[in-house]
């Protein structure tokens, strides 16, 4: 099975120059855990996870106790906290490669890029687990 058969193709991306407030809003409004960031040419530049974001924000953000410092933190640019030098895969790669990359690198998702490093999909450990569970259930029925 190829990655392209199970990857999420409808990507939600954000400019790496967007403020953290926009990254937070995007992660929350789409209920996603991984946000791919692009450069001015639309190429994959990095990623912010919900965990990365909350590590950099005060727990008082969005509450009545929010301070000026909290507000200033939200204006930082996404590229200031994004993960760079991402491990990626290509759509034609086998699913087995995805499993090994996720496991061996202790990561929870893989951006899928084309030959020009443009993000064309994303695959998470949950996507892989879903496929494996379906295959297991099929075997049980036979």
Residue ranges and their predicted role:
Residues 27, 35-52, 102, 110-126:
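A glycine-centered beta-loop-beta connector
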Residues 59, 108-109:
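Glycine-centered flexibility motif
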Residues 14-32, 37-38, 88-106, 113, ...:
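The conserved cystathionine-beta-synthase
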Residues 1-10, 49-87, 99-103, 119, ...:
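Tandem CBS (Bateman) regulatory domains
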């Amino acid at each position: 099975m190829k990655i392209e058969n199970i990857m999420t193709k409808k990507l939600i991306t954000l400019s790496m120059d967007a403020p953290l407030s926009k990254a937070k809003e995007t992660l929350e409004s789409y209920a996603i855990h991984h946000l791919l960031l692009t450069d001015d040419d639309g190429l994959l530049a990095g990623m912010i996870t919900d965990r990365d974001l909350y590590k950099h924000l005060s727990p008082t953000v969005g509450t009545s106790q929010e301070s000026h410092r909290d507000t200033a933190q939200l204006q930082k640019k996404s590229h200031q906290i994004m993960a760079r030098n991402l491990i990626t895969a290509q759509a034609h790669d086998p699913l087995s490669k995805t499993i090994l990359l996720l496991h061996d690198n202790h990561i929870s998702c893989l951006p899928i890029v084309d030959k020009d490093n443009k993000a064309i999909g994303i695959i998470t450990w949950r996507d892989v687990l879903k496929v494996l569970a379906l295959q297991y259930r099929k075997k049980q029925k036979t």
